Amino acid sequence: MATLLQLHFAFNGPFGDAMAEQLKPLAESINQEPGFLWKVWTESEKNHEAGGIYLFTDEKSALAYLEKHTARLKNLGVEEVVAKVFDVNEPLSQINQAKLA
């Protein structure tokens, strides 16, 4: 079953195009993660937060990525990562044009 991972954390920038340029190598590497399907990058310069919404093929892959990414962020000085993991209701999501693959 597809699994959604939602996370956010305190982030002081850069934001926007500068963030995209600086984090492009990270974005490209995420594509290689086992079970990874897609990510929507999120940011709020106003609230000094960043994060993302990820879709994985299964919960095991989502949790493995969460563990890896949380450790990476902590090494960069991020003190707290707020994460939630959800099962995806695929029949209802498809009615609303969700891209699940």
Curated annotation (Swiss-Prot):
Keyword Oxidoreductase: yes
Disulfide topology: none
GO cellular component: cytosol
Enzyme Commission identifier(s): 1.-.-.-
Domain of life: Bacteria
Record bears the keyword Oxidoreductase: yes
GO MF terms, alphabetically ordered: oxidoreductase activity; protein homodimerization activity
Entry keyword set: Oxidoreductase
NCBIfam families the record matches: PRK11118.1
Annotated PANTHER family: MONOOXYGENASE YDHR-RELATED (PTHR39169:SF1), PTHR39169
Self-association and partners: Homodimer.
Function: May function as monooxygenase and play a role in the metabolism of aromatic compounds.
Listed name of the protein: Putative monooxygenase YdhR
Name of the gene encoding the protein in the UniProt record: ydhR
